[in-house]
Amino acid sequence: MPNFSGHWKMKQSENFEEMLKALGVNLMLRKIAVAAASKPAVEIKQEGETFYIKTSTTVRTTEINFKIGEEFDEQTVDGRPCKSLAKWVSENKMACEQKLLKGDGPKTAWTREMTNDGELILTMTADDVVCTRIYIRD
């Protein structure tokens, strides 16, 4: 099992604004979110299959606690409450499906994967739009 623990800084981001657009975020809020999320600070604490992930930007900070295979509460990237379930899909990769608690919207999910060279790849999806963010240890 890989060790996701550590402080991470973003090295590369693709399609973040496109994903926000797919979620229905208006243009002005998308521009603010893209600017604010250009240098997120991510802290991950892992104890076996239990995770704590804190993501901080200039606009907001989110924190999630979860255990692989157990449903938990979190928010979609645009702030809507959802129930989530993370599972291992390979030795180095977890995938999480999100179900909105209220209303309709695109199907959302995320994955986190450790590469052999120590990078952390976060993918976030909204229907068929995929955002990829690559992090390195800080």
Swiss-Prot record:
One of its GO terms (biological process) is fatty acid transport. All-trans-retinoate binds at residues 133-135. The keyword Transport applies. It is found in: Cytoplasm. One of its GO terms (cellular component) is cytosol. One of its GO terms (molecular function) is fatty acid binding. InterPro entries: Calycin, Fatty_acid-bd, ILBP, Lipocln_cytosolic_FA-bd_dom. Its main location: cytoplasm. Cytosolic CRABPs may regulate the access of retinoic acid to the nuclear retinoic acid receptors. This is Cellular retinoic acid-binding protein 2. It comes from Xenopus laevis (African clawed frog). The lineage of its organism: Eukaryota, Metazoa, Chordata, Craniata, Vertebrata.
